[in-house]
């Protein structure tokens, strides 16, 4: 039996709406037309926002500064399960939203900083096909990509933040201050590096208390690293969560009164035990038309040999894997709204057949490194645990209607089918 690909009723549009909504709230606080800012942020023509239900200036909070704290790998379900160890975050009003498809870092961080879904910005998976270089990782393989801002197609929103009079900043590890992905998704932001989570939050606190209006992106990847190495249910992951919570508590206690904070994530995590890491038999008959395999263990992308029929390959692979995976063609995934609107040339970055793991399992390859095979915590797929992320509100955003505005902004996209959030 071949399982039909599910329809994406939420393809990450709310995640995409967070930074546009925050910048618009700062614009309102600075006396700049926030509706025009929203139109520019999401790429619709001037005046078009007026017809959208519930989208008006009075629906936005009035902010001096805005901070989005992006915690790599902190899923909504992960946070709920360990809420006793994250008391500061758990006190924040929180809604569950969904990340992009695939639920992977390169795709989701780019959506967060550009306000565009993967089909538009182009970083549509972990290992995807470059027209000249072949399969490349969207996190690591940037050194041979000459035009990085063309490979990532969408403009980061930090330039818009500067245009309204705010200071755009990005705060993360010193090691992330330069590099291909940083250049592609953080262009326009002034980078501040700090080794520890506490020091990153301290930098944010100092900048916010300096007086100038700020739009800040603060990135924490320690939980993701801990989950990959030992699992999100490990003691190491729990220690990282406690460190994050303590640092955020200090940040929230030192906030000026007109600063809004969002805590969210790029994806959640599931733990995959060793016996559920299934090696794909790429030399078998059912894979005979497959030239290369990309993606990642929870969502594999099959690139076919010239002349192969994607429908036939999808059927054969799907019959072989049965209930272990959703298997469908690239065209089917696009038609079911997985990636949002598709810009020219982006579909070809994916393989013609998509294999998505179901349950707590993953699909490894014979060529995978020992480190890749040993990964416990994983993501990339469609499960509720992977795709559900928090939208937690702090500071001036508590009780402000910010979450509802995020939902309304997401819902006006013709490529999405989402119900507005309510506070």
Language-model segments: residues:
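Feature captures the catalytic ectodomains and active-site-proximal regions of enzymes
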Residues: 1-423
């Amino acid at each position: 039996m071949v399982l039909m690909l599910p329809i994406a009723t939420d393809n990450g549009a709310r995640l995409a709406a967070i930074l546009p909504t925050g910048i618009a709230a700062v614009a309102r606080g600075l006396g700049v037309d926030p509706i025009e800012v929203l139109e520019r942020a999401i790429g619709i023509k001037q005046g078009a926002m007026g017809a959208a239900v519930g989208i008006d200036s009075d629906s936005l909070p009035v902010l001096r500064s805005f901070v989005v704290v992006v915690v790599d790998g902190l899923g909504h379900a992960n946070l709920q399960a360990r809420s006793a160890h994250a008391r500061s975050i758990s006190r924040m009003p929180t809604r569950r939203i969904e990340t992009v498809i695939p639920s992977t870092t390169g795709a989701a961080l780019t959506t967060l900083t550009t306000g565009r879904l993967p089909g538009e910005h182009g970083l549509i998976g972990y290992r995807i096909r470059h027209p000249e270089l072949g399969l490349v990782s969207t996190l690591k393989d940037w050194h041979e990509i000459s035009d990085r801002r063309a490979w990532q197609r969408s403009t980061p929103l930090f330039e818009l933040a500067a245009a309204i009079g705010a200071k755009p900043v990005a705060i993360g590890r010193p090691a992330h201050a330069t590099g291909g992905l940083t250049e592609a998704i953080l262009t326009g932001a002034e980078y501040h590096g700090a080794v520890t989570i506490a020091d990153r939050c301290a930098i944010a606190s100092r900048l916010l208390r300096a007086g100038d209006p700020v739009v800040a992106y603060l990135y924490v990847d320690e939980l993701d690293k801990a989950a990959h190495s030992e699992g999100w249910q490990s003691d190491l992951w729990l220690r990282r969560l406690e460190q994050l919570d303590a640092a955020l508590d200090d940040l929230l206690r030192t906030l000026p009164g007109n600063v809004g904070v969002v805590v969210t994530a790029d994806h959640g995590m599931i733990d995959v035990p060793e016996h559920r890491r299934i090696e794909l038999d790429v030399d078998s008959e059912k894979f005979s038309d497959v030239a290369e395999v990309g993606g990642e263990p929870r969502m594999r992308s099959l690139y076919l040999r010239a002349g192969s029929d994607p429908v036939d390959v999808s059927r054969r692979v799907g019959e072989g894997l049965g209930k272990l995976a959703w298997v469908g063609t690239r065209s089917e995934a696009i038609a079911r709204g997985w990636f949002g609107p598709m810009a020219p040339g982006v579909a070809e970055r994916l393989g013609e057949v998509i294999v998505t793991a179901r349950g707590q399992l993953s699909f490894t390859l014979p060529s995978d490194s020992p480190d890749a095979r040993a990964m416990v915590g994983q993501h990339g797929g469609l499960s509720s645990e992977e795709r559900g992320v928090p939208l937690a509100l702090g500071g001036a955003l508590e009780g402000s209607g910010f979450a509802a505005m995020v939902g309304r902004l997401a819902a006006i996209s013709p490529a999405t089918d989402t119900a507005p959030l309510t506070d």
